[in-house]
Design a protein with these regions (language model features):
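Glycine-rich, anion-gripping cofactor-binding loops and their flanking helix/strand elements
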Residues: 1-62, 167-175
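Short, well-ordered beta-to-alpha junction loops that form the rim of enzyme active sites
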Residues: 8, 156-160
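Short gly/pro/ser/thr-enriched loop/turn and capping motifs at secondary-structure boundaries
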Residues: 11-16, 46, 68-72, 89, ...
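Glycine-centered flexibility motif
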Residues: 13, 51, 83, 157-158
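A sequence-level detector of short, solvent-exposed, charge-rich linear segments
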Residues: 16, 24, 53-57, 80, ...
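Generic recognition of flexible, low-complexity loop/linker segments
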Residues: 26-27, 49-51, 140-143, 150, ...
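Thiamine diphosphate
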Residues: 28-34, 72-74, 80-92, 162-175
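Phosphate/pyrophosphate-binding active-site segments
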Residues: 58-157
Length: 175
């Protein structure tokens, strides 16, 4: 599927960060610009700003879940589909495959994601800033040298989460 994907705490790891559709570094931009959001088996909670139009300015929501409770909390979807998410997304994919739609925004958001990662990784991390404080990227750069490949990454606390999403390359990650 060529559909941009954002994960949350509940779904982290379902689609690897290396997948070209995972646009974790473009989270804010994607949420504010999306015209369609498909929620698969999850509630609209604080991680998604409860679906607030202040964040999701133009978005329509399709909500798919095996649980009726997940379909009706907060902002309602149109449609709301009570189904196994895997089955529903496969049917949607089959229908979209027959469509000819403009993928300009999809390509733009993926490029934005890659550029943002590059910008963060290209910053000189071994120096302190003008305020003599450490660059948060240095933390993750140093961690790469001491952790195993299959470590479980956990990040908590405000701004550090933005840096962790880009710098903490963990197969298993929780924030």
């Amino acid at each position: 599927y060529n559909i941009p994907y954002l994960d949350t705490q509940d779904s982290r790891g379902l689609i690897p960060q290396s997948n070209s559709n995972n646009i974790f570094a473009a989270r804010s931009k994607a949420m504010s610009e999306a015209d369609l959001v498909i929620l698969l088996g999850r509630k609209l909670d604080y991680q998604l700003a409860f679906g607030s139009p202040a964040v999701f300015k133009e978005a329509k929501f399709i909500r798919i879940s095996e649980s009726a409770l997940e379909l009706t909390d907060n902002r309602r979807g149109f449609p709301e589909i009570l189904s196994d998410p895997g089955v529903a997304i496969e049917l949607i994919h089959n229908k979209l495959n027959k469509s000819n739609f403009d993928e300009t925004w999809i390509n733009d958001i993926k490029n934005f994601h890659l550029e943002k990662i590059k910008k963060v990784l290209d910053k000189e991390v071994n120096k302190t800033g003008d305020d003599n404080k450490i660059n948060p990227n240095l933390i993750f750069e140093k961690l790469k040298n001491i952790i195993d490949e299959d470590f479980i990454g956990i990040a908590d606390g405000g701004d550090i989460l933005s840096f962790a999403r880009v710098g903490l390359h963990s197969k298993y990650y929780i924030d």
